[in-house]
Amino acid sequence: MSRTKDPAKQAEDLREKLRYHEHRYYVLDDPEISDADYDVMMNELKALEAKHPELLTPDSPTQRVGGKPREGFVKVAHSAPMLSLDNAYNEEELRDWARRVEELSGKAEIEYECELKLDGLSMALRYQDARFVLAVTRGDGSIGEDVTLNLRTVKSVPLGVSSATLKKTHMLGDFEVRGEVIFPTKSFEKMNEDREKQGLAKFANPRNAAAGAVRVLEPNITAQRRLDFYAYFLLVDGRVHIDRQSEALDTLEKLGFKVNSNRAVFKSIDDVLKFIHKKEEDREKLPYEIDGVVIKVNSTALWQRLGFTGKAPRWAIAYKYAARAAVTQVEDILVQVGRTGKLTPVAALKPVPIGGTTVSRATLHNMDEIDRLGLLIGDWVQVERGGDVIPKVVKVIDDKDHPRGKKKFKMPERCPECGGHVVRTEGEADHRCVNANCPAKLRESILHFASRGVMNIEGMGDSLVNQLVDRGLVKNVADIYELDEEKLLSLERMGKKSAQNILDEIKGTKKLPLERVIYGLGIRMVGERTAQFLAEHFGSLDGVMKATEEELLEVEEVGPRIAQSIHEFFAEPSNRELVKRLEAAGLQFKGVKKERGTALAGQTFVLTGSLPTYSRDEAKKLIEDAGGKVSGSVSKKTNYVVAGEEAGSKLDKARDLGVAVIDEDALKKLLGK
């Protein structure tokens, strides 16, 4: 017990001691005192702060847990985008990336910093005046959710940094730490054992459990989950200020953050690959889940020179380990109906653990895939799951230990949801329900419209959408904008605050850009990327609606089938009426038209092989920005074939047809670079 008479000094001494021992226990994993001794100090500080409330500080160890349950999460813009990384799945792809880095940077020797890719939830922590003030989830990379109260309960998150430490590390401004919230394997297994004893459903995997724990509305529940936080990125006053990533990680450790010790710096890709393969061998021994290794250019000065692609930095890449697999039995084949009416066969599997997740379903894509596999109900199959990819059936096992099934699957002629006719258009692999009023199509179209990356309407999930459709409150996505408090309060488990939160979320969608609106319409074959290209090319939804198929073909990545799909969608009167109602609701129907150059206007290019400095996507974008068009196949209409290393059959065909073959340097000259 402290004998200091001054309560303020006594409280500060206790806080310093508790922070020190929390760091020893939760960050260094090297405690110096027993839990009982720690509890004595904690209780002494609680009593002192209760007696002298004016002494309570936001970064006190007593303030980790507590607070009333919240109604929802506030959305917060990131100080700088939290971008995803490009992936490499084999040695060749990693070497291609390294070669591009060397060419673009103009450096023959590059230092590569390697870190384990933890399988958790990305998080940004902000510190002002050395105190932890905000935690934001990654969200869509631009906007996340404020989960500060929950992250305060994670013991490896420092609530503050001492002035002495700041001075020692030359941290002169406010700073932001990015990292991964994970569920350590032992804690996860213990929690699932406890849930099983209580008759509760077990969590499928540590990543999902961590994400769920971060997003519960009661911080006390987060505290019970014993999560961990590993830091991997440091921003000071919104910018990178340390010369090397390896030094930034060292600084994070000095600031009191937990940083993964499985990291190293190498000067050759050969050594990087040795590190990658060694860590894959050690994977099962680690106290947490990983799904690969992140490789970064160590020099942060080169980060500026290398820059970014559309969604990822050029100075980093994630080497993803091969999918984990297991053998199990197909108990049945079910059919799901999607928002475009597509019928997708799904294998109902005997539950099997794969990479920390219990898998009981696997997509079979379409009837052609079932025929290719030669799959029968009752067969034993190999199932793979990699990262967030939906589990898939890779092959049928046919040996004496795994007898073949007997029952052949047949695609239904009537929709399992509405009984409508099912058709398969000539030249397509998919079967579709043609009933425009199919409730399954309606449900899926609304879920798509409300999903993250589209309109991002928080709270509009399966349960709410099912009620809205079943009660006839929503018959298309435009009806969402006619919902009011009275309609929402008529639904089960809906209170005033929840109803208001949903209405606020719906109102917020009116500020989202044109490409989100186009993507949200659910036009068949129009994904997020194509929607963005349409918005950039035409600059308004009216321009897209009025475009002919020929005009649509001028848009990047739009081929004949996509052009036909877009044209047919807007030719349908009910869809035009839907668009009219969405415009009346106040959604963004105008964007910024991206003007393209004319240097390569009217020229058609085909890319083949690996180019020295450009990735295929980068070369394609440069050509299209200059007014050219990139095709996937060589024909007499092709003007140039751009050939790199290991060019394939397209090069042979170009020579046969007499099409000009050029290399990357020649392409740069055509581009005026």
Curated annotation (Swiss-Prot):
Signal peptide: none annotated. It is an enzyme of class 6 (ligase). One of its GO terms (biological process) is DNA repair. Residues 595-673 form the BRCT domain. NAD(+) binds at D35, A36, D37, Y38, D39, S84, L85, E115, R138, E180, K296, K320. Pfam families: BRCT, DNA_ligase_aden, DNA_ligase_OB, DNA_ligase_ZBD, HHH_2, HHH_5, Nlig-Ia. Its cofactor is Mg(2+); Mn(2+). InterPro entries: BRCT_dom, BRCT_dom_sf, DisA/LigA_HHH, DNA_ligase, DNA_ligase_CS, DNAligase_adenylation, DNAligase_N, Hlx-hairpin-Hlx_DNA-bd_motif. It catalyses: NAD(+) + (deoxyribonucleotide)n-3'-hydroxyl + 5'-phospho-(deoxyribonucleotide)m = (deoxyribonucleotide)n+m + AMP + beta-nicotinamide D-nucleotide. Keywords: DNA damage, DNA repair, DNA replication, Ligase, Magnesium, Manganese, Metal-binding, NAD, Zinc. Its EC number is 6.5.1.2. The active site is at K117. One of its GO terms (molecular function) is DNA binding. Zn(2+) binds at C415, C418, C433, C438. Transmembrane segments: none annotated. DNA ligase that catalyzes the formation of phosphodiester linkages between 5'-phosphoryl and 3'-hydroxyl groups in double-stranded DNA using NAD as a coenzyme and as the energy source for the reaction. It is essential for DNA replication and repair of damaged DNA. Belongs to the NAD-dependent DNA ligase family. LigA subfamily. This is DNA ligase. The lineage of its organism: Bacteria, Pseudomonadati, Acidobacteriota, Terriglobia, Terriglobales. The gene is ligA.
